[in-house]
Amino acid sequence: MTMSDGPDDGRRRRERESLADALTLSRSALGITTPNPPVGAVVLDPAGAVAGRGATEAPGGRHAEVVALDAAGDLARGGTLLVTLEPCDHQGRTGPCSARALAAGVARVVYAVRDPNPLAAGGAETLRRAGVDVARADDDEVAAAEQGPLRAWLHRQRSGRPYVTWKYAATLDGRVAAADGSSRWITGPESRHHVHGRRQEIDVVVVGSGTRAADDPSLTARSDDGAPTDRQPLRAVMGLTPVPPDAAVRGSDGRFRHLATRDPAEALAMLGDVQHVLVEGGPRLAGAFLAAGLVDEVEAYLAPIVLGDGRSAVQGAGVGTLTDAHGFEVRENATLGRDVYLRMTRRTA
């Protein structure tokens, strides 16, 4: 049964609006939930008014459903729980969300994505057997949830490795530096602001030894005034060259890793159970991940300038002829000041 199978157009409209709200809420959990999924949930009271909203807390904290149900209190009884991921049916550091929904007395549950984790799946069936009206979201909402904040977690569950995004900033002709090596700044402040926001949403930022030596980046997430933000990714340098003790990337918070390998697959394995890895540079590192078939997503920040010469955004991607090109589909585009932002995922067919 899907959400559209219900008889009430007004109810469907409210549920669609609430599920869209839950999807937005789930984004607020990005960067803090690993190894758990970033989930959003909304509770409607029996009259259809919003009674509670929530997103997944850090590991050991409450799941999104529990946050929303706690906020709703007695208003949840006889109401509807809408959630971006099937309620878990697993006792871990926290109890099953299916049991919490039953205890709250909800009459209906609508979820978007089926839980692919065999340890946690089954919440929908448990609720259904207990007499709760359970429905799956419509196909467009399922697709939005799967391509939204859950995409890295789902990829980790299905493939056994982290979701990898290659991010770069370049000119219209694909240059990341001029012939003299100058590169600050190719893109404008709006693009840089966007990048720092993205760093807060992922688990690890990786650069190669060459970029570390050339630019001495800190790889931190910063606000517009340069101050570090509350959410910080793990910072990693990949390559066999030792990272000096005074390198900016080391920082002082202990959130640094040296991945002493040239093999992208081995580097990902060294990172453990992280969900989302952001590969920021340089060209050889990007080429190595592309050649290994390990780039799932590309985020490009393109400045409206042409250099003609200089360093290319990628080198050694393992492509000898046009038919072997790495293909991607545009999922999102935006204008950031004078720049253009593109988010693309790997083409599967």
Residue ranges and their predicted role:
Residues 42-144, 288-290:
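Zn2+-dependent cytidine deaminase-like catalytic core
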Residues 45-46, 158-159, 345-347:
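Active-site beta-strand termini and strand-to-loop segments that position acidic
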